[in-house]
Regions:
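N-terminal and secondary-structure boundary signal
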Residues: 2-340
């Protein structure tokens, strides 16, 4: 159990069956079958679409992987110490310090830049997927600019040119919900902030689930490395929304076609595709606040509470497992049923 006021680390191993861990385990065979089916089709035609869309790290670089491991840093839930006066956004210096501490603890590096070097190479093209759907009205519940900025700055400090760094979202109002380039919250010169609008995709169609064709957006496919930044929220369709769904339904051209049956197994299959898995490098969860009910939109402020955490992982399933348990613990304390 995480204790407020201290810096803590939690590790989860892949055998757990809670939440998204069990979800992906249950659908892993289907994901493999999907990939094998595409490979068989490619062999029959002499083409290799998966190989063409799969990327590899720069020569000689091996990004750090720690399956099942999640590191959380917390400084408690004192709003005065953590948050700006509106209690919606973290204090910039607090967000920066907590992120660096989480990165250092996760990697064992001596500072935040050295930690980022474990995941990003100067020759990478970097896409940073943020989440702002809950912040489109009043900037209330989105990945905070105060956390996005130090991530971008660390990537630049590694040596990646700014023109090779893109912060992206699905829609313009989702992107503005993060306050990127809003009200003076500027990204470093040359770094792009873009939205794809479910239309900007350059790859061929792929069929991932039940023959439904889709494309991943160009900001993801043109990158060699993806940093995934999301939140801790419940979701009225799929139960929990965090890192996995941020990439899947936030990076394809037809997310509306992949929500049936509570988006199960679509989330797992879309995420487990080599297009995604070959690019994932780092997952950061903005846990300064969370929504435990009536999500994913921030429609009821009474369902949004201070949580005071920053999480780092290379395993989106492990982190979503942790996030789901965090929400279930809150719901149990409030006499509500589990998300499961």
């Amino acid at each position: 159990m995480f204790r407020p006021g201290t810096f803590m680390e939690a590790s989860m191993r892949q055998g757990s069956t809670h939440g998204r861990r069990g979800f992906l385990a249950a659908t892993g065979a289907a994901a493999t079958a999907c990939a094998l089916g595409q490979e068989a089709e490619a062999a029959a035609t002499g083409a290799s679409p998966i190989d063409a869309l799969t990327v590899r790290p720069p020569a000689g670089f091996q990004p750090m992987k720690a399956p099942g491991k999640v590191t959380k840093v917390s400084k408690g839930t004192d709003a005065t110490a953590l948050m700006q006066p509106n209690e919606l956004w973290p204090r910039p210096e607090v967000a920066r310090q907590m992120l660096e501490r989480a990165m250092m603890e996760f990697t064992g590096a001596s500072n935040g830049v050295e930690a980022m070097k474990k995941f990003i190479h100067p020759d990478d093209v970097v896409a940073i997927k943020v989440n702002g759907i809950g912040g489109q009205s009043g900037f209330t519940m989105a990945v905070n600019f105060e956390l996005i900025l130090p991530v971008v700055e660390a990537v630049l400090a590694v040596g990646v040119p700014p023109e090779k760094v893109t912060v992206y979202e699905q829609y313009p109002n989702f992107l503005s919900g993060t306050r990127v380039n809003i009200r003076g919250n500027k990204l470093p010169d040359g770094v792009r902030a873009k939205f794809h609008g479910n239309t900007l995709a350059t790859m061929p169609y792929v069929s991932v689930y039940q023959g439904i064709r889709t494309k991943y957006c160009r900001f993801l496919t043109e990158a060699t490395a993806v940093i995934n930044m999301s939140l801790i929220k419940d979701h009225n369709i799929c139960g929990y929304t965090g890192l996995l769904k941020n990439i899947t339904h936030g990076s394809i051209i037809n997310p509306h076609d992949h929500h049936t049956t509570h988006a199960n197994p679509q989330i797992a299959l879309l995420y487990n595709h080599p297009i995604v898995r070959s690019r994932e490098r780092l997952h950061i969860t903005d846990g300064f606040k969370l929504i435990y009910d009536e999500g994913p939109l921030d429609k009821n402020p009474r369902r949004r509470i201070l949580h005071g955490g920053v999480y780092v992982s290379t395993d989106a399933v492990a982190m979503d497992t942790v996030g789901g348990k965090v929400i279930d613990d809150v719901r149990r304390d409030k006499g509500m049923k589990s998300l499961a």
